Design a protein with these regions (language model features):
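Active-site histidine-anchored catalytic micro-motif
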Residues: 1-131
Length: 131
């Protein structure tokens, strides 16, 4: 379980790497599944936070809160846009495991991207398979 602080990205790489290490799997795959439809899992640059700021700005322009096209408005003006943003990104990721950890590129990090304005408790299932 991960607690978000509202709209934006939260790096979860270290938590995922700890799960993989505890699994005892040295070679295989790590599958991540987010149990929600208004947030995403993304593999993104982890060195320059401006990258994630730019992604957020672009997504807000692409799918603005309170768009008059949306009929689903009962949960607030940010809910339906959050569902669409989730569809445009990912709610699951599969990563290679080598030497007992996720084999990520130098500048890659795993992020939970919250699309709602308020913070939420989010659940990620981590499944590690291999040898």
């Amino acid at each position: 379980k991960v607690r978000t602080r509202g709209r934006g990205s939260l790096q979860v790489t270290d938590t995922i790497q700890q799960h993989v290490a505890r699994s005892g799997i040295t070679q295989g795959l790590c599958h991540l599944f987010l149990h929600h439809t208004s947030a995403s899992l993304v593999l993104c640059e982890n060195a320059d936070p401006d990258v994630r700021t730019d992604m957020e700005r672009y997504m807000l322009r692409l799918v603005p809160d309170g768009d008059s096209l949306f009929e689903h408005v009962s949960e607030g003006p940010d809910d339906m846009p959050a569902h669409i943003r989730s569809l445009l990104t990912h709610t699951d990721l599969t990563l290679p495991v080598g030497d007992g950890h996720c084999s990520l590129g130098t500048w890659q990090g795993v992020y939970l991207w919250e699309h709602r304005q308020q913070g939420h408790r989010r659940q990620i299932t981590v499944t590690v398979t291999g040898v």
